[in-house]
Swiss-Prot record:
Higher taxonomy: Bacteria, Bacillati, Bacillota, Bacilli, Lactobacillales
Catalytic reaction annotation: alpha-D-galactose 1-phosphate + UDP-alpha-D-glucose = alpha-D-glucose 1-phosphate + UDP-alpha-D-galactose
Name of the molecule in the record: Galactose-1-phosphate uridylyltransferase
UniProt pathway annotation: Carbohydrate metabolism; galactose metabolism
Similarity annotation: Belongs to the galactose-1-phosphate uridylyltransferase type 2 family.
Keyword Magnesium: no
Entry-linked PANTHER family: DUF4922 DOMAIN-CONTAINING PROTEIN, GALACTOSE-1-PHOSPHATE URIDYLYLTRANSFERASE
Organism: Lactococcus lactis subsp. lactis (strain IL1403) (Streptococcus lactis)
Amino acid sequence: MSIYQSIQDFISLALQNGTIEPLDELYHRNQLLHFLGLNDWAEVDKEAHEKDSLILMDQLLAIANENNVIEKGQDEFYEAALMNFITPRPSKINQDFWEKYKTSPDAATQYFYELAQQVNQVKTRDITRNIAFSHLTKYGKLEITINLSKPEKDPKAIAAAKLVKASSYPACQLCLENEGFYGIGNKPARSNHRIIQVSINGEDWGFQYSPYAYFNEHSILLNAKHQPMEINKRAFDNLLGFLDQFPDYMIGSNADLPIVGGSILTHDHYQAGRYEFPMAKAELREEIKLQQFPEVSCGIVNWPMSVLRLSSKNQVELSKAADELLKKWQVYSDESLQIKAKSADGKLHHTITPIARIREGKYELDLVLRDNNTSEIYPDGIFHPHPALHHIKKENIGLIEVMGLAILPARLKTELLEVEKYLLNQENEMSEIHKPWAEELKETEYFSKETVHETVQEAVGEVFEQVLKDAGVFKDNEVGQKGFYEFINFVNN
């Protein structure tokens, strides 16, 4: 197919998406020719030969590279700017989204999600590179992902970033100002990035899909203001308010304290999606009564972390009950279990990771109790993956991991292959950090070429299960569960 046919097919997508009107076609063509380093044209078929936007993207990027128009280390920025040619303006997308919303919330989100994939805002090809498997436990099936989707910066891009003058705009990667931002240095390319303007409880928010999605329709609800994360009654109201508008999605928040929180605490945001996580499938271990809230059902979830599940048709009472539990947890200590609400200097150590959904006509809130205390033995966190597990997972246990989906570092793809060679007594370059674990596996398992890969994955699953147990404040044993019931009594008194 000729380069001009590729360009014409790309323009056809812009027309189809409503990015341009028919009268804009010649103008759009000339802008695109210049962008690709071309100054000529040959007539081609108006009817598209290729309709896959990502194949066309590859073809046009090849043209740009041939014409030397992409500067060293600028591939990511140029690619996003190219896809911006077929991405409708924010006003057009918002108008179409809310028009489709009149049919149903599902129609609106499906429109936006499909468009985000087509214009490569959601990087579907990169996401398919992830390695995924599961691990069956007494709590249900945990999910494990080795995250390969986010490409490593090449040396040229790193060198180019060092030469860029520091900028405070946008203030962070979650600010609304990223929409359409070309990108510079260590600030990612967002030319083709679009955000839906949403009102939640009278506040302005933005709804976008995550470029490197960890689960189906992984989306982010971000505050229009650059302000810190905070778990409080307002947060519970926001989660439940979002469900009123998008009942087919779940939504949750990272905790708002270091160690137990996510990677971005400086910008208020939540994560949502059309996905049932392992924790959502977990049943109640035992139902309990909240004396002050007769309209709210409550129970302890059968999960390695310490989770209370609240359920009610009454959204107001549900939010009040969650707030009461949060306030009680923020002042509760049990030093026999190393649970300590405050430091001597008054610093708070307790918060909650909340997750909301609608199930069988009722609002449901899972409240995961978190404690970010440290000690001499556990300087990274008492309720954080312990050092023996750091060879697999040492990062914070955020919202997604809490719900039973491990996001493991890309290094494990090659490192685990070397572990397999070691277990088969083959020549290997296994990292020393895996040696104690691998030696333990060797003592307990017989390995063959046919079974070693699956057995190592199973062992990784066991590590993730232990990671969640380490993060649990009331351990799943007799002493820990006794402590959990003492906390419930404290809540009710």
